[in-house]
Design a protein with these regions (language model features):
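Extracytoplasmic thiol/disulfide redox context detector
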Residues: 2-105, 178, 221
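Residue-level signal for pocket-adjacent positions within structured domains
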Residues: 47-49, 132, 198
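Glycine-rich, flexible loop/turn motifs
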Residues: 48-50, 110, 164
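C-terminal cap of thioredoxin/glutaredoxin-like
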Residues: 2-24, 30, 34, 68, ...
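Structural alpha/beta surface segment adjacent to cysteine/selenocysteine redox centers
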Residues: 67-70, 75-155
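Surface-exposed loop/turn and secondary-structure junction residues enriched for glycine/proline
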Residues: 41, 55-57, 72, 80, ...
C-alpha cells in the first residue's frame, strides 16, 4: 500500500530513487525525458478532467476506486480481482464504478496520461496493460526508458507515435490531472492506495472478490 505522504504535488514531484523519494523541480522532471514542464505558472483546472466510469449511473451502489499505476497493491487488485468484480457487480447493474488516478510520482502521471489519451472507450484496456506490465516499466529507474515503455503500451492500444508524443507533451493535461487528483484526495480524505469509497464509506487496501463483494452487498442492503 502506498500512502499519500509521498504524493506528487504541483510544487514538486516525488521520484523513487535509491530506495526513497526525492524532490525534483518541475523543470528537471520535464527535461529528464522531454516531457511536460509542470511549472506553477501553467493554468490548473481540476474541472477540466472527467471521471472514468463503468456501469449504470443509477446502480444502487457507487464505488470509487483511488489507485496509482505505480502502486503494486493496486496492480494486485486489478490483475487478480477486478475482472471478476466487473462481471459480477458492475456489468450486472449492481455497481456504478468510478476509477480515479492518484499520483505519487511522475511515472504514474505519465501512465494516466497515456491511458486517457487512448479515449474513454479504450481506457480500461490500457489500464489492464499498464497493471499487467507494471513490473516491466514502472521500476526501470531511468525516466527516458519509462517513457519509451509507456509509449509501447500506448501503441498496443492503437495510438500512433505522433499521438503519443503529443499526449506526453500536454502540459495542460498534466497540470489539470494533478490539480484534479489533489481536489479529490482532499475531499474524500484519500491517504493510501488502493482505496475504495463505497456509498460514501472509505475502505483501504487491495481486496479479494469476496472482501469487496461483501462490502458492496452490505452497502446495498
Amino acid at each position: 500500500m502506498i500512502t499519500r505522504r509521498n504524493a506528487l504535488t504541483l510544487a514538486g514531484i516525488g521520484l523513487v530513487a535509491g530506495g526513497g523519494f526525492t524532490l525534483l523541480r518541475d523543470t528537471e522532471m520535464g527535461a529528464a525525458a522531454g516531457l511536460p514542464d509542470l511549472g506553477a505558472a501553467n493554468a490548473q483546472d481540476a474541472g477540466a478532467i472527467e471521471d472514468i466510469t463503468l456501469g449504470d449511473p443509477n446502480a444502487p451502489v457507487k464505488v470509487v476506486e483511488y489507485a496509482s499505476y505505480t502502486c503494486p497493491h493496486c496492480a494486485t487488485f486489478h490483475n487478480n480481482t477486478f475482472k471478476e468484480f466487473q462481471k459480477e457487480y458492475i456489468d450486472s447493474g449492481k455497481v456504478h464504478f468510478t476509477y480515479r488516478e492518484v499520483f505519487f510520482d511522475r511515472y504514474g502521471l505519465w501512465a494516466a496520461m497515456v491511458a486517457r489519451c487512448a479515449g474513454a472507450d479504450r481506457y480500461f484496456g490500457v489500464a489492464d496493460l499498464l497493471y499487467q506490465t507494471q513490473g516491466q516499466w514502472a521500476r526501470q529507474g531511468d525516466a527516458a526508458s519509462v517513457a519509451e515503455s509507456l509509449k509501447r503500451v500506448g501503441a498496443q492500444a492503437g495510438l500512433t507515435p505522433d499521438a503519443l508524443d503529443a499526449c506526453l507533451q500536454d502540459a495542460d493535461m498534466a497540470q489539470n490531472l494533478v490539480a484534479w487528483y489533489e481536489a479529490n484526495a482532499e475531499e474524500d480524505n484519500v491517504r493510501s492506495t488502493p482505496s475504495f469509497l463505497i456509498n460514501g464509506e472509505m475502505h483501504s487496501g487491495s481486496m479479494s472478490l469476496s472482501q469487496i463483494g461483501a462490502l458492496v452487498d452490505d452497502a446495498a442492503s
